Amino acid sequence: MSGTHQQHADQCKSDFLIATLWRNKPLETIKAYIALTKPRVIELLLVATIPAMLQAERGEHNIILILLTVIGGWMGAAAANTFNMVADSDIDQRMGRTRARPLVKHTVSNRDASIFAWVLTVASFLWLWLLCNSLTAAVFVMITIAFYIFVYTKWLKRRTHMNIVWGGAAGCMPVAVGWAVIVDQFPEGQPQQWWQAIVLFLIIFFWTPPHTWALAMKYREDYKAAGVPMLPVVRTPVQVTRQIVWYSVATVLVTFLLIPAAGWIYAAAAVLAGVAFLWMAIRLHLGIKNGAEVKPLKLFILSNNYLAVLFLALSVDAVLGIQTIGEMMGWNTTFF
């Protein structure tokens, strides 16, 4: 049988299997489509978008607009994650952590997953543009999807150990999307405030490597088997944890840049949570260096909690409209 005929036969077999699943187990199929969107990964969307929007308009908040933005952003993130699963379906088969994914188990076909992703992409663009009145945010989401798939998934991920450093920029975009929606509500805009969005972007940018590498240390053999050159695969544990410490330091330092534009609640969280985050990163490095038994997953979990606490504090600060540190110090309040 020729290659073309074999592919056609495989596709027909897959379509028949999925049609049967849908007819006999519709709930399982729905769950499979939800799994394609990587719900846990999308949690970062909520953690980042909402605080950014609240900070962009301190003391005032439009709940409906925030909800609409989160929905539009969710569709964009879900589209990117689904495209990612389609592109990575070959390596997902070789990783124990990902062998239960829908495309590997053939619960959903690659073709149907791609159609699903395209529908979400178009819906996200139209939603943010028309319902959130922000063409800027809609364009940001399209750029993010393209970057995540073509730059990170298809190029960086399989070619360089710096994949998550540069590819992680896609995960920083929710803050830019949320900020753009608020700015676009004002005809004259607030260009002087964009520096805060850039700081929020950089916080997630520097936070992503230690967060991801901690997880990759645990699943090092999985990545190695799949041929993905994550840093823990191509470097020694000591070298990896040293990089984790440096990126953690950069993360905490960048969080301090936002203190003048925030109140004491955020300032306290940035310092206290930052110390805890740094201590855990340093402890992991010292443990590896001294040959002690360590659990990198603890840092992974703490890094999630760290970002959540930091952005929760920023949200509370913004909602309560607490006087900013910059205002307390008598600095230029127009800028801050």
From Swiss-Prot:
Matching CDD domains: PT_UbiA_Cox10
InterPro entries reported in the protein's UniProt record: Protohaem_IX_farnesylTrfase, UbiA_prenyltransferase, UbiA_sf
Cell compartment(s), UniProt: Cell membrane
UniProt keyword terms in alphabetical order: Cell membrane, Heme biosynthesis, Membrane, Transferase, Transmembrane, Transmembrane helix
Pathway: Porphyrin-containing compound metabolism; heme O biosynthesis; heme O from protoheme: step 1/1
Membrane topology: Multi-pass membrane protein
Superkingdom of the organism of origin: Bacteria
One GO-annotated biological process of the protein: heme O biosynthetic process
A GO CC term assigned to this protein in UniProt: plasma membrane
Reaction(s) catalysed by this chain's protein: heme b + (2E,6E)-farnesyl diphosphate + H2O = Fe(II)-heme o + diphosphate
Job description of the protein: Converts heme B (protoheme IX) to heme O by substitution of the vinyl group on carbon 2 of heme B porphyrin ring with a hydroxyethyl farnesyl side group.
Miscellaneous information on this protein: Carbon 2 of the heme B porphyrin ring is defined according to the Fischer nomenclature.
PANTHER family xref list: 4-HYDROXYBENZOATE SOLANESYLTRANSFERASE, PROTOHEME IX FARNESYLTRANSFERASE, MITOCHONDRIAL
Stated name of the protein: Protoheme IX farnesyltransferase
Gene: ctaB
